[in-house]
Each structure stands twice: as structure tokens, then as C-alpha cells.
């Protein structure tokens, strides 16, 4: 039989949980923003097959001797290293797999939209090299905005507030793309988690769907769609591309472990043949 007392109790419990989560979000311990350089480990892993002519060139579970490593939300290439961005506003310059005694250099963005030592104030979701060569763009949630930093991430060059009726605190810009010299953004609601400009000028989207069975993900560009052979527990958040000597393209993809020690941060290298 329906009971108003049971309904009231359920609502009270739900309200208490939501209030506790909100309090926890606002009162998390201050983040450690000190720079560090630590060893990074690449453990080869086997993933599923990928449709030809694409080829998996390598896959690794990546870990480092710093508990701030992970939570990847953006990826680029800078000075020969992989440059990853976490959703806590931390930059990670990672030596590539195969490097002798590889390391990762971790440092904080020099300025952020909100309280610098709180996750809510530095919720960075996307990274893009400025098409004009001035530096790097970073997209933020919570305080929805685009920030342009100089090439060395030492200072802020420009801040653009972004307003959209569909945004909520934790759902806003998810992807940045270089659209023939223009900076374009995509919201999380589009399903895109990152984008990369290919050497031939095409824009490739990294898309995903999160359902009851886990995460499914794929790459989409120029009318093509390529399913990614990742585990349903892997959440791909970051994509970048670079040309190969043979005219092909190397794609680098990283997953977000949500900074949970029991989840892996996966790095996947995929080679595409030269475009015809």
C-alpha cells in the first residue's frame, strides 16, 4: 500500500544525499598545485581488433608516481612530448612510450576561472593549440569560458566567457577544434569528447555513448566511422593527431580514469594510411 510516510522518508534520504554531495563538492581538500617531475610507466596491454586499414600501433596502461596523474580531458603534442590536460587544471608533459627512463612533468595552469585550489574552480575539459600560433586554448566548465594561454603556459592572453542555455554547472564545452584557423567548440550534449585536425585538413571527432552496459566509442571524420576496440569500462576523453613519415597519420587517444586508483589510464596509438 502507498504510504506518504515512506514517500517522505525516501525524499528525505534523497535530499540528505544530494545535500551531502553538494557540501562535499564545495569543501573538498585544497588541491596540490606544486610542480613535480616523476617517473611514468607504460604497461603494454592487449585491446580488441580495429577495422582495416587502420592499425593499432600500441596500447598501454599509463601510471605515474603522483596521485594527481590521471583524470585526462584533453591532449596535444608539444616539443615532442604528449601534453595532457586533466579536468583539474593540471598539465602533464609525458615522454612517449619507448623513451628510456620516461618521466611526466606535472604543473598547474597559471590562472583559472574560479578558486585556484578547488576542483570546482579549475574544471578544464578541452585543450587546443591556437591556430594563430599564440599558445593554447583551454575550455572550462562550471565557469563556462575559453582561456588562451601563452605557448609556455606562463600567463593568460585572453578570456572569453561562453553562455549557452543548455549548459549546466558540470555540463558545458567538451571539445575544441581547429576549423581552418577558427576555434570551434562543441558541447558535451553532442556526444563528442574531443576532436583533432588531421594533416589533410579534415576534423576528426572522438565520440562516445555511455549506457547501462558501459562506454562505447568511435572516431568520425569525412563521412567515415571507426569503432574503437576499448573495454566498456574505458572512457576515452582525449585525442590528438600527427603526421607519419610515410604520409599516414598517427592518432593518440587517452582515457579518463576519474582519478580512481582502481581504474586505468589508457594510451592508444592508431595509425591511419595516407589519405587518397
Regions found by a protein language model. Give the residues of each.
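Sequence/structural signature of beta-propeller domains
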Residues: 2-276
Amino acid at each position: 500500500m502507498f504510504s506518504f510516510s515512506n514517500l517522505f522518508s525516501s525524499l528525505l534520504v534523497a535530499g540528505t544525499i544530494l545535500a551531502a554531495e553538494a557540501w562535499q563538492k564545495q569543501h573538498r581538500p585544497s588541491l596540490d598545485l606544486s610542480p613535480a617531475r616523476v617517473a611514468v610507466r607504460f604497461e603494454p596491454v592487449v585491446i580488441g581488433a580495429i577495422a582495416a586499414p587502420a592499425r593499432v600501433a600500441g596500447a598501454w596502461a599509463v601510471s605515474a608516481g603522483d596521485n594527481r596523474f590521471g583524470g585526462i580531458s584533453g591532449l596535444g603534442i608539444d616539443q615532442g612530448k604528449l601534453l595532457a590536460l586533466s579536468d583539474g587544471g593540471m598539465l602533464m608533459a609525458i615522454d612517449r612510450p619507448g623513451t628510456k627512463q620516461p618521466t611526466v612533468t606535472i604543473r598547474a595552469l597559471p590562472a583559472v576561472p574560479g578558486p585556484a585550489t578547488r576542483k570546482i574552480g579549475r574544471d578544464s575539459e578541452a585543450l587546443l593549440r591556437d591556430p594563430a600560433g599564440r599558445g593554447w586554448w583551454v575550455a572550462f566548465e562550471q565557469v563556462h569560458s575559453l582561456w588562451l594561454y601563452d605557448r609556455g603556459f606562463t600567463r593568460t592572453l585572453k578570456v572569453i566567457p561562453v553562455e549557452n542555455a543548455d549548459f549546466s554547472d558540470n555540463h558545458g564545452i567538451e571539445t575544441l577544434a581547429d576549423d581552418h584557423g577558427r576555434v570551434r567548440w562543441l558541447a558535451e550534449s553532442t556526444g563528442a569528447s574531443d576532436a583533432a585536425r588531421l594533416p589533410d585538413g579534415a576534423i576528426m571527432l572522438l565520440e562516445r555513448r555511455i549506457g547501462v552496459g558501459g562506454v562505447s566509442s568511435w572516431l568520425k571524420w569525412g563521412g567515415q566511422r571507426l569503432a574503437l576496440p576499448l573495454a566498456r569500462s574505458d572512457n576515452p576523453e582525449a585525442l590528438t593527431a600527427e603526421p607519419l613519415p610515410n604520409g599516414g597519420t598517427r592518432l593518440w587517444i587517452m582515457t579518463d580514469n576519474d582519478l580512481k586508483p582502481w581504474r586505468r589510464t589508457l594510451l592508444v596509438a592508431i595509425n591511419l594510411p595516407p589519405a587518397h
